[in-house]
């Protein structure tokens, strides 16, 4: 259904697709508009299902000044509700836990069951009847759904269903069986930068050569273009890349998969570059799949994914969530604004286990500063750039970001979809634009965004 709407003015709007005004990344006015029109209307990853495995388990999701309880009920159903007592507004939960049967307000003892229904009001007769309506004194529900091993919430009760809001990323990542991934570790960082700057560092490949030079496979593919291809050197370079990614991310490419690659290092490959590369990936993908299936792991058919062009996806779900699967495992990122120039970034390293394996319940991590020496090398390199960028944007000589039409196309597309939300466009006018950004950001050019 098409709704009547009146476009609202946007401060510092993107008027030229490849130029983003600098004020978008530090203006309080712009930040407040995002809180009102973006974060109140979009689907957000609230927690992993692993965080609430048992009846009564709950997690607390915070976005700006809004707090949401996500709970698995005794009936197995997952619900979300605003984390505020209906009496005088006290937060009911400040950390994840298990509520057994009910939530109790620590101030005056109002009680709520796992569905949010009010079960007790002390001195009930002292309240006027108009303050005791059953719906009014129950916790306000929040729209929620599950996908990809996570619970998602949307503060807008009129928002369209989750699945249609996160395509085509959902279908692509379903092929990778991301719902079967389980957490190995979960880290969090407090970055002194705007949330958009923080995540845009992971939405383009343009920076890799300078920021992450260790990731550049230096001779092999270049040599192949000049008639210097050597299958042995190619395999050595590929395995070195896997080691570098695995060690640099403390995951993503799992050490188990690197070991599988090492076990086939000495295979014979054709002299023709294209044939050798195809043969290597076929053997490697087959070996990884066979290894994990022998252990009882639910792992996708990597050979089939390669044939379908899905072998190296980077799933992005607007506005704040990434999944980066590689071979058996993956990393995922979530970004949440704290202030115009402060962001919490979280990283999960995930891999596969037998379906009946017992895993510890993930708990929210300590939030590390961006320059903490415990960060793995690759995110540490990104974190070193970001505070300098945030400071540089305040220069009186700098007006706007100049974006590459190809290498940074997703940044432009993202910013213009954001403007659609900030203009107050209804969900049905935003649907097609969302499909342009719920994709692998590394492969996007600047595209026409139509509302």
State where each predicted segment sits.
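Short, contiguous pre-domain boundary segments
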Residues: 7-22, 179
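Short Pro/Gly-enriched beta-strand edge/turn motifs at strand-loop
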Residues: 41-51, 123-127, 314-318
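Rieske [2Fe-2S] iron-sulfur-binding domain
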Residues: 51-157, 161-175
């Amino acid at each position: 259904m098409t709704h009547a709407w009146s476009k609202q003015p946007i401060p510092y709007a993107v008027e030229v697709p490849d130029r983003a005004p600098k004020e978008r990344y530090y203006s309080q006015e712009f930040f407040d508009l995002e809180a009102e029109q973006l974060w109140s209307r979009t689907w957000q990853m609230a927690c992993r299902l692993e965080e609430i495995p048992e009846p009564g388990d709950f997690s607390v999701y915070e976005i700006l000044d809004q707090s949401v309880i996500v709970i698995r009920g005794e009936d197995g159903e997952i619900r979300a509700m605003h984390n505020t007592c209906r009496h005088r507004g006290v937060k009911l939960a400040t950390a994840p836990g298990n509520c057994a049967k009910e939530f109790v307000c620590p101030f005056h003892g109002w009680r709520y069951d796992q569905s949010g229904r009010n079960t007790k009001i002390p001195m009930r007769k002292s309240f006027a009847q108009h303050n005791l309506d059953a719906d009014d004194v129950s916790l306000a529900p929040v729209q929620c759904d599950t996908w990809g091993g996570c619970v998602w919430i949307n503060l807008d009760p009129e928002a369209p269903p989750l699945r249609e809001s996160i395509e085509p990323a959902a279908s692509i990542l379903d092929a990778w069986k991301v719902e079967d991934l389980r957490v190995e570790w979960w880290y969090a960082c407090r970055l002194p930068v705007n949330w958009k700057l923080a995540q845009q560092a992971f939405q383009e490949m343009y920076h890799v050569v300078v920021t992450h030079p260790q990731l550049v496979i230096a001779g092999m593919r270049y040599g192949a273009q000049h008639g210097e291809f050597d299958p042995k050197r190619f395999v050595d370079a590929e395995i070195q890349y896997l080691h570098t990614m695995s060690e640099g991310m403390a995951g993503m490419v799992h050490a188990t998969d690197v070991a599988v690659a090492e076990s086939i290092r000495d295979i014979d490959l054709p002299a023709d570059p294209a044939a050798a590369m195809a043969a290597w990936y076929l053997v490697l993908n087959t070996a990884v799949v066979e290894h994990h299936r022998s252990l009882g792991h639910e792992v996708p058919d990597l050979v089939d994914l390669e044939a379908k062009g899905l072998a190296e996806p980077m799933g992005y779900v607007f506005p704040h969530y990434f999944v980066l699967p590689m071979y058996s495992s993956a990393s995922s990122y979530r970004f949440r604004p704290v202030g115009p120039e402060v962001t919490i970034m979280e990283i999960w390293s995930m891999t596969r286990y037998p379906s009946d394996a017992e895993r510890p319940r993930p708990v929210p991590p300590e939030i590390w500063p961006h320059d903490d020496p415990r960060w793995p090398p690759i995110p540490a390199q990104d974190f070193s750039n970001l505070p300098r960028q945030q400071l540089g944007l305040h220069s009186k000589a700098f007006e706007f970001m100049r974006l590459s039409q190809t290498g940074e196309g997703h940044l432009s597309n993202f910013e213009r979809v954001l403007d659609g939300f900030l203009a107050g466009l209804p969900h049905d006018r935003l649907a097609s634009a969302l499909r342009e950004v719920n994709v692998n950001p590394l492969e996007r050019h600047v595209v026409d965004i139509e509302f």
